[in-house]
Amino acid sequence: MDIDKNKRIGLTDEQVKQSREQHGRNVLTPPQRTSLWKLYLDKYRDPIIQILLVAAFVSLILAFIEKNFMETIGIFVAVFLATTVGFYFERDAAKKFNLLTALSEEQPVKVRRNGKVMEIPRHDVVVGDVVLVEVGDEVPADGELTLCNDLQINESTLTGEPVTEKSLEGGGDGAYPRNVILRSTMVMNGRGEFVVTAVGDATEIGKVAKKSTEQTSVETPLHMQLDKLAKMISKVGSVVSVAAFFIFLIHDILTNPAWGGKDYFYMAEIVLKYFMMAVTLIVMAVPEGLPMAITLSLALNMRRMLKSNNLVRKLHACETMGAVTVICTDKTGTLTQNKMQVSVLELKQGDEALLDIAIALNSTAELNDGKPIGNPTESALLLWLDAQGKDYEELRRQVNVLKQLPFSTERKMMATLAEVDGDTYLFVKGAPEIVMKKCVIEDRMLRQTAEELDEWQHKAMRTLAFAYKKIEASIMRTSRTSTAEVVALLDANDLQLQAIAAIADPIRPDVPAAVQECRHAGIEVKVVTGDTAATALEIGKQIGVFEDEPENIGADGSLTSLDQQMITGEQWEALSDDEAYERAKDIRVMSRARPTDKQRLVAMLQQRGEVVAVTGDGTNDAPALHYAHVGLSLGSGTSVAEEASDMTLLDDSFKSIANAVMWGRSLYRNLQRFLFFQLVVNVAALLLVLGGSVIGTEMPLTVTQILWVNLIMDTFAALALASLPPSHEVMKEKPRKASDFIINKSIGFGILFCGIVFFLVMFALLVYCERRGKGGVDVHELTMFFTTFVMIQFWNLFNAKALMSHHTAFRHFLKDRGMILVLVFVLVGQWIIVTFGGEMFRTTPLSLHEWLLIIGSTSVVLWAGELWRAFRRMITKRR
């Protein structure tokens, strides 16, 4: 392969095909997955399943004594169903989480092929490709540098070295030669080009088999909170069941004369019967559906949020977004369309040809068949050149670049030292107030330029200034064109103002409404931008972040007073910590902000007890993204920002942030609904089993019946309620506190009230059946009792759906397909169990009249809920 030619034009399509066949795709082989059988068998390690298995074997002993194996078979079938259904849903959730890995391989990479710069997915990179990298990029493959401009790489993923200086020369005292660049490392400064030497598993990161995808198994704060709740309920249930076992056994020993005889089989049967009662209590008390409800909710939310352009990288972001009280957002791309166009470009001094060269050189962007690749501002300038009929690539080829000082948020400018027709020039591009300070300008031109810039900035345009100077030959003979030399040339402050430009980037049409939606939801929106005060003010006005319109913006675009709602980065830095703490709440727009200013604002807001979400697209945004409760990177942003974030906005839009808040709040609400439904069942069933034993009847609910109820309550209720779509109504509420317990007072009261009422109704039915029958409660009556209990929960599922809402439970009912499927499954499943369950479920078929009677009478649960919600609607309207 001709290396020099390859550097200039890259690979051809045929060479790409040959390289891929020879060296393979640029994909790391994922770690060996645990086999499906092992994952399935792991379900049997669940304590509740193990308790059920013990119960099944105890039941088997009883079956041999009584010569009746149907209930035992029922328990084993129920255990199999519970583990299989749980296994299926967890596998389905895992598949949804694996989307992260697949999407990370779609990360765009800039390469030179067929003489053109283009973007391709990371997995399409092949050995021999010429790859272009700049600040914030993740290196997609191993290679050798062919161009190196102040390139600094973070190699901590491989060597532990946070920053390594790179050069075109090999050697050095590092773990790898200085001209070698490696996959999964990050570009922290400068830019470079390299020829790929290894892809996929052949890379250094592939050899050490280090997992390169985002971890998703970390427990979220809510998960941990609910885990504690589940353990607490389990302990209470276990204590009650053990106490019940001993109380009833002792009571039987004291009152049953059989214990004085020698019928040991009968005694063992009594002990086993009470043991089964204790197991039934434990099974009913332990809310083993909680972990699955959370996993299922998070997985469903993650999949759906992806469809609304939110890629969740860390699970806690799903729930934390629901508690956000402040959003600190960038301007470019998030609030604007990121479709930058040069509105005005005015030449001030020098000839037009030099300005064209300055624009072409002071840029890391590229055009591929007119499609911009790279920084939007620089892309707009290249498109402007293209519209003038000038080829930026030809302009670059005509000159010899000696040194380039890349743009940084600290410097707010970029500089290139280059030879043009035998002369040496320093070309500078950057923020007008920075560049103009380094120029020699007449007062009249300074005033005129300041007025023009102010006019453009008040139209929310981004402004740039270009400057240059010709370098004396005597200076160049003694210069080594190092970074320090270029900085020294800039610090001489003797540049000539070359041109000024205004670049328009319209506000996204959906942003003002999204900002207002957030404000109505009790969320403050703060714009943190690198633009001038006047530009930032206009943006703030257009999207509606201000309480009242701020004043006192000077003609030069700077703030002439410390208006409470606006501040510059420089003024923010000058405040003491106490002053900054007080100001943080009132700030709506921070202009000319640096990354350290954004991080300090986040820190101050957090000290005030706010839950903060932050957007960022650049490498220097990483600290603020790390610091925030939720870091939101932009899909068009750098890999460094993406790695530091918790969620990625694939379309970069602020509307997606508002959607993420709605999703987070809806997720929390759905989990509250599930908890209400689950715990009402637990309270009612626990009291029923105890109550039935107190009046001396057989256990009103058998182990197999309890397992069916648990399957409904845990698995399918979790599916139904977790799959409820998000509602914009949650955006009318104030944010919850992050420290709030998920079961608030009203939900706790509802659980106890409904649980006790359901128990009293069912217990009254049990007592009625006990007293009506001469020989106790028969199987037919117990079947009606069991079906009544299930149907009460069936109707209560509607109430759970409408929990904490004034609306009818039938609102958007036909859209809730998951809910409809679960309701149909429960109804059909109950009919099958009652009709064909027989001895296995201790049931006998019911007549149509009995079914209609049970369904009609238990529906009172729903209609009572509907009346209560109608009453609340009426009260709300009167207010």
What is each residue range found by the language model?
Residues 713, 758-759, 783-798:
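Generic alpha-helical transmembrane segments
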Residues 767-768, 772-773, 777:
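Long hydrophobic segments that form regular secondary structure
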Residues 778-782:
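Transmembrane alpha-helix entry/boundary detector in multi-pass membrane proteins
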Residues 749-765, 791:
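Alpha-helical transmembrane segments of multi-pass integral membrane proteins
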